Design a protein with these regions (language model features):
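Extracytoplasmic small-molecule ligand-binding "clamshell" domains
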Residues: 1-57
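Hydrophobic/proline-rich hinge and linker segments of small-molecule sensing/allosteric domains
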Residues: 1, 69-91, 104, 173-177
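Beta->alpha turn/N-cap motifs
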Residues: 1-2, 35-40, 49-61, 76, ...
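Ligand-binding cleft/hinge of the Venus flytrap
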Residues: 5-9, 21-30, 92, 105-125, ...
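Periplasmic-binding protein-like
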Residues: 75-82, 127, 145, 149-191, ...
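A ligand-binding cleft/hinge motif common to bilobed small-molecule-binding domains
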Residues: 41-44, 56-66, 111-114, 134, ...
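Extended ligand-binding regions for polar small-molecule ligands
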Residues: 18-27, 86, 93, 99, ...
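Short helix-initiation/N-cap motifs at beta->coil->alpha
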Residues: 18, 33-44, 87, 104-107, ...
Length: 208
């Protein structure tokens, strides 16, 4: 569950990632079947053939490239989310000494842990971080840009993006390490989806 990218809506999994993967599957002549897996077990399941691909807002990092093949499908920033009543923080460095909530095993967690004297709380589910902020148990959240934008739009009286953390970074679809034929096929489909405007149409549906 990571709206607007992917979430379970009364038994139906939907979102930007879902529409994009459905389009890729269609161009490969297959039908995508989706399952929900805990975040920190995603690459493990992939390595033992529990599923063929992972699309879950996964930043492409050197460490992950050692574990899996990755096909870039988007780039985005990490953003800082705070209460509208708080003194706004616009950079990672300005979070020094503050209480930061993040999802475990994410780029956001790595960034939070790099902040001097920060009190970092890591949670299994990203939505817990928003509850922590809502209830005043943290000063800020570091989260993927699309999710921060979604919650700011959903509840502007509770959440506001005050700044960014780091540079815009690539996000990828993960395939089993060595699954080069499937990786190449998905890369080709992704290139076509970007070239013919389909990627923009899917993006506009969920983010505009």
């Amino acid at each position: 569950t990571y709206p607007p990218l992917e979430w379970n809506d009364n038994g139906t999994i939907k979102g930007y990632d879902i529409d994009l993967m459905d389009e890729i599957a269609s161009r490969l002549g297959v039908e995508a079947e989706f399952m929900s897996i805990k975040w920190d077990g995603l690459l493990t399941g992939l390595s033992v053939n529990q599923y063929d691909a992972v699309i879950s807002s996964m930043n492409i990092t050197p460490g992950r490239l050692e574990e899996a093949n990755l096909v870039e499908y988007m780039q985005w920033l990490q953003v800082i989310v705070m209460s509208p009543d708080a003194n706004p923080v616009s950079t990672l460095e300005e979070l020094e000494g503050k209480r930061i909530a993040v999802q475990v095993s994410t780029t956001s967690e790595e960034m939070a842990n790099s902040v001097k004297d920060a009190q970092v709380s890591s949670f299994e589910s990203f939505d817990t971080t928003f509850m922590e902020l809502k209830n005043g148990r943290c000063d800020a959240i570091i989260i993927d840009e699309p999710v921060g934008m979604y919650y700011q739009k959903l509840e502007p009286s509770l959440f506001v993006i005050t700044g960014t953390a780091g540079e815009r970074a690539p996000v990828g679809i993960a395939l089993k390490k060595g699954a080069n034929a499937l990786t190449d096929a998905i890369q080709e489909a992704m290139d076509d989806i970007k070239a013919d405007g389909t990627a923009d149409r899917i993006y506009d549906k969920w983010f505009k």
